[in-house]
Amino acid sequence: RGIGAATVLEFARAGYDVAFTWNSREDAALDVVQQAQALNPGGRFVALHADVSDSAQVNAAVQETLQQFGSLQALMCCAGIAQQKLFTDLTDEDWHRMMGVDLDGVFYACRAVLPGMIRQKYGRILLVSSMWGQTGGSCEVHYSAAKAGVIGLTKALAKEEGPSGITVNCVAPGVIETDMMASFTAEDKAALAEETPVERLGTPEEVARTLVFLAGRGAGFITGQVLGVNGGIVI
């Protein structure tokens, strides 16, 4: 759903074969496969079930992708959860679940794909953080901490893997119209749009098109960067 689904479709439109993971809704995943196939009839699209907070499931998904496609040119990590809660009300479970999906899952996926990318001396790793990973968000401390961790991972991994022909970049979306905003009222959204210099909210497709650009060979001299797709709300 959201940025993930939009990204699969944009990569399909750009001519890529795509394997992606789903966790809770197989019907939605299969619908994305059908849409991708319609955009790129000659492409191959595979939906794999995985909870990204489980390293064994992530490893299995990567191995299945390699078996079906032979090699992996790019990895994009955008699975995420969000939760609004006072810091003093956070439970251990809240904290560990947030880190498990939003940060541990990124680590597991990068670790799983890197051996193959290193062998082939080429790879694009694309991570999704958030503007809250850059600025911090009140009542979203655990989410902000996880997304800040993604930014730190991006910068450090880019330095380590650059000599192997692998770039690592991160997109930090601003306020994007996705399911995560379901609890926001129309008034809330209008206020957020007013705070944004371009005076509107972003779309998943705008984030997805940025990721497709970073995956391309034309972005080979860009690495370790955090690109804000945020309408100017963070400058």
What does each model-identified segment do?
Residues 115, 159-160, 220:
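Alpha-helical segment proximal to the catalytic Tyr-Lys
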Residues 130:
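Residue(s) in the substrate-gating loop at a strand-loop-helix junction
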Residues 16-31:
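Conserved glycine-rich Rossmann-like NAD(P)H-binding loop of the short-chain dehydrogenase/reductase
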Residues 73, 81, 88-108, 122, ...:
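Catalytic Tyr-X3-Lys loop
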Residues 1-19:
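Canonical Rossmann dinucleotide-binding motif of NAD(H)/NADP(H)-dependent dehydrogenases/reductases
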Residues 110, 146, 154:
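Active-site helix of classical SDR
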Residues 70, 162, 167, 222-224:
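Short, small/polar-rich loop/turn modules that mediate ligand/substrate recognition or access, typified
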Residues 86-87, 94-96, 181, 188, ...:
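Substrate-binding pocket helix/loop in short-chain dehydrogenase/reductase
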